[in-house]
Amino acid sequence: MKGSAVTGPFGLSAALSEREQAGLLRSRIATDGASGGRLRVAGRDYLNFSANDYLGLAGHSAIKTAFQGGIDRYGAGAGASPLVTGYSRAHQQLEETLADWLGVEAVLLFNCGFSANQAVLKALLGKDHLLWQDKLNHASLQEMGSQLPCKMKRFGHNDMTALERQLEPNRGLIVSEGVFSMDGDQGSWRELAALAAQSGNWLMIDDAHGLGVLGSEGRGTLAAQGVAPASVHIQMGTFGKALGVAGAFVGGSRELVDYLVNFARHYVYSTHMPAAQACAVSQSIELVRAADEARAHLGQLITRFRQGAQALGWQLGASDTPIQPLLVGESGAALQLAERLRECGVWAGAIRPPTVPVGTARLRITLSAAHREQDVDRLLEALGPRPSTDERGGAHGA
């Protein structure tokens, strides 16, 4: 008989054992709070270089006050799908604020970026369409693309020549990221917009990690690269990174949003985000738009870290954003380095396959405007000079 009362039909124990033996088993650590570039775990305080709170807004008093005010007015939860009674004036106001900020006709709110990305692809793409994706796109995009009836073609990371060879006129959707979440580099959006226009295909940006950090008033990667919003048919962004709250949105034409309201199953069949959360995000946007000084400070910290780490012999990815991949190579070496930093009171996450390709394990170091120069210096001191190959026990850089 296949399966049993003990093991079941799914091979859970074997799968977990295989992950553990490969040094890839994941687990969770409960924190006692994280804000302002700090983290408390098991009663100990750490410098936090692993969060996506790029502007340090997650603990901002004005956002917390707006959240509480929203709870007082609307309650703790939406209580229904947005197409029933879960859509409030607070949601509508946030959509209008986002549309004005980002230069799009209309916006639709989602509970998270994963569902927003998947909702768009599933609603738009049928068996007669083509989907082109950068090979380093987020798992939400890659996963949904592989499940759709359309044909998905992946092009090498930021390889516009390869994409141009793959394109067919008026057949579907090109998707790439503003800032790539594991490498910190930016998509080539001027070239992408030009190729989309020339081929008659639609273009979508996942700007989860660019929004709030890049461009005038934090408008994101398109603004930073001088790309008109109208040349990108679909914008997706999130509220849980630089904006310091949670949730996501899709922006574009009014017709696109009306279509998604009717055909995006992740939207139609989910309880809406709490109205109080929308109140908090609206307040956050106001702060982000005025945060030029914080963005300038963040840029200085990025430069300070990169210069210091390279002087110590560490290999970094080609990133000028808050995401700084410190490339280690083997998973075991990345875990050991992360543990050594924790012993020094510094928290930085080790990223291993399958999140990144085999042989490219890394510390994903993220900087925040809440950090100080002395915090970066303490991180560099904890890292110390990069060990030689022999000292690393055979580990190698990616």
UniProtKB/Swiss-Prot annotation:
Catalytic activity: 6-carboxyhexanoyl-[ACP] + L-alanine + H(+) = (8S)-8-amino-7-oxononanoate + holo-[ACP] + CO2
Involved pathway(s): Cofactor biosynthesis; biotin biosynthesis
UniProt EC number: 2.3.1.47
GO molecular function: 8-amino-7-oxononanoate synthase activity; pyridoxal phosphate binding
Biological process according to GO: biotin biosynthetic process
Residues annotated for pyridoxal 5'-phosphate binding in this entry: G113, F114, S181, H209, T238
Domain of life from the UniProt record: Bacteria
Cysteine disulfide links: none
CDD domains reported for this sequence: KBL_like
Matches recorded under Gene3D superfamilies: Aspartate Aminotransferase, domain 1, Type I PLP-dependent aspartate aminotransferase-like (Major domain)
One Pfam family from the record: Aminotran_1_2
Keywords recorded for this protein, A-Z: Biotin biosynthesis, Pyridoxal phosphate, Transferase
HAMAP family for this protein: BioF_aminotrans_2
Quaternary data: Homodimer.
Protein function: Catalyzes the decarboxylative condensation of pimeloyl-[acyl-carrier protein] and L-alanine to produce 8-amino-7-oxononanoate (AON), [acyl-carrier protein], and carbon dioxide.
Stated family: Belongs to the class-II pyridoxal-phosphate-dependent aminotransferase family. BioF subfamily.
Protein name as catalogued: 8-amino-7-oxononanoate synthase
Gene field: bioF
